[in-house]
Amino acid sequence: MQHFSRTFIAASISTALFVPTTQAEANINDSVQEMPATDQCLVETSGEEDALNTPVVVEADNLQAINGDKAQYSGNVQVTQGPKKITADSVTLHQQDNVVVAEGNVTFNDGQVKARSDRVTNDINQDTFSLENTEYQFLCQQGRGTAAYIARTGQSVYELEDGSITSCPEGDNSWRLVASGIDVDQDEETATLHHPRFEIMDVPVFYVPYMTMPIGNTRKTGFLFPSLSYGSSDGMEVEVPFYWNIAPQYDMTLTALYMQQRGTKLDTDFRYLTDGWGEGKLKGEYLNSDKKYQDDSRWGYQVKHDGIINKQWIVKVDYSQVSDIDYFLDLDSDIGNREDGQLVQEGHVQYRSDFWDASLTVRDFQILLKEENRPYRLLPQLDLNYYTPLWGDHLNFDVKSQVSRFDTSDTARPNATRVHIEPGLTMPLSNSWATWTTEARVLSTYYSQDLTGLTDVDLKNQLDEQVSRVIPEFRTHAQIYLERDTSWVKGYTQTLEPQLQYLYVPEEDQTNIYNYDTTLLQTDYYGLFRSRKYSGIDKIASANQLSYGASTRFFDDDYKERLNVSFGQIYYFDKKTKISNSPNIPDETTNYSSWAVEADFNYNDYLFYHGGVQYDIDLSSMQLANSTLEYQFNGGFIQGNYRYVTREYIEDTIILENLDTITRKGISQAGIVAAYEFNRNWSASGQYYYDLNENTDMEWLASLRYQSDCWYIGLTYSNQLLGWENQAIGSTGSSPEYENNFSVNFGIQGFATNQSTGTAVKELDGSDNAIKYGRPFYLNN
């Protein structure tokens, strides 16, 4: 036996101790300090043969060697092979078996795992190793923990016995999974756990006999982490999602949601991507025997598909249905929201060519209101459009045609078939500073209205079974773009964009035609220059009018838009073409429409404003207004908003039989919304809306959230106005009815389940309140 004192020994061994030569790659988490180079993920690049021939360097205080048998290193032993390292109190190399054993305060790092162990055994020939009584941390994926025994059975494949795993940073054991066996495949980024139990602060919460879970950011089949919540409405809730990576182009998420006061709801979300046929998703939700809903089963499903085939065919499907009208009021759903009044059920296919296109549409609705005013079913509608230039870019010809079948089960309304053909000539002229477009169209429509069995006698006497209508339309619109450098504010460019439009549509009696799919459009500034007042063709409003207005914009030296002000009005040559359903309009009206004004402002990218006003000169009052001011700062924002609509404007634009059940005085609502992130862990958000007409709260929400590197908890209180007693809004003795809800949400972060990286804005966007946070700022930036 030979003895060596403190000696640096370099030995080129024909077989290597560890995995192939690697290349360092940074893998830094913002939540922790950057690890030393030896603690960073190393991506394997060389093959097994190279690994077996990589030299190993050993440094130790002492060496005892028996030729042909073993070499024993002791005292501050350090074994390295490139970037890979073992340190220990003693290391023994068994030469006959090519096995290395390290004992006593062992640290190990192979570029994929770093560990502290009592003992490490390495089989040089097989390039495998085992660790005993170990604390470990993966370097290429999230995950750390402890294990009584760890074995590497293949490249990037690890087997743990009596171990634990968590994504929490070192020193934080807020949660962990403890299992009798854990199989980790870092290449596949999955962990398979045998008899795992989930622990929070070392307290077991639940147990399953078997589970797999992803440990990276790629799509892998396995359980995602559960979330816990408590709400005053549904009690304790536990949500457990499972992700199934069926194929590269298909996947599904299955979620079990236990609600203490309702039962267990099962949700499915299947997504697919086809080769050449488009993409889509299928969603399903089922709750058997809802304890708070007469023990009835409740369900919902949604089918969506969007596809473009061979660049010419377009296929769209959007079909949703739920079991009852209270579904979204009672249950959180990915199919719809609590403010939804209807669900669309539509299929659409279209073919496009260079000069023509054709489409077929089928549409129905599920109404979610107790007082149904059900839209017509479209069974079906065929559109055929043709376009061709006649004289270069200066004269175009087009034809729009449509055949529609309207169907309803309401015996008080007729079924109908509508045929519409609309040829038109358009003459567009433009240069760098102006545009001028003139068009003439002929609107030809035929109706076949089925009045048989119509129970509304007055309506039956008013309508005709066969109606033919031909209405010409003429429109010319011009706009000029002027620009100058401002003299009173240096570095800014101002534009002036006046526009003028004349529109003529002769008057036609259309009282013998029922309204099937037509609504009055909002007349804001941009609506002044439309050619139609209605969205459909059942009502073609007569017009003999001149629209005029202008916009001015201010751009800074980076040509970023900072201010935009627009204003305009319509002059009616024939006062009879002014549309009004309101009985409050005075007999002596002017020939002018309301003034429409829009304004947007952006000061230094932290103060934003948007406002809009419609001022009725006949009533000498403001009919509609909205205003939003938002201040943004580091970590948050605060927004104030106001909306105002007179009852007269509502009566003028919407025909409602029971308007008093909705509002007595119109709309006058003020709101404030704010959110702030105190630091990387704490954030808060809130919103409050008040009805100034009825002097009552509309809704408010307050939320406080804490988020660490591996878990989060949120507290939310919401209060929402549902209605008034007996629908008597603001009446003496009638009080508002509210829904109050307090909730606590708890969830796990890590292993590809970072459900909320938790900005305060996202908290507001994800709230269940009817009035969502919005940013109505329209400057071109």
Swiss-Prot record:
The keyword Signal applies. Residues 1-24 form the signal peptide. This is LPS-assembly protein LptD. Disulfide bonds: none annotated. Keywords: Cell outer membrane, Membrane, Signal. Component of the lipopolysaccharide transport and assembly complex. Interacts with LptE and LptA. The keyword Membrane applies. GO terms for biological process: Gram-negative-bacterium-type cell outer membrane assembly; lipopolysaccharide transport. It is found in: Cell outer membrane. Transmembrane segments: none annotated. GO terms for cellular component: cell outer membrane; transporter complex. The gene is lptD. Belongs to the LptD family. Together with LptE, is involved in the assembly of lipopolysaccharide (LPS) at the surface of the outer membrane.
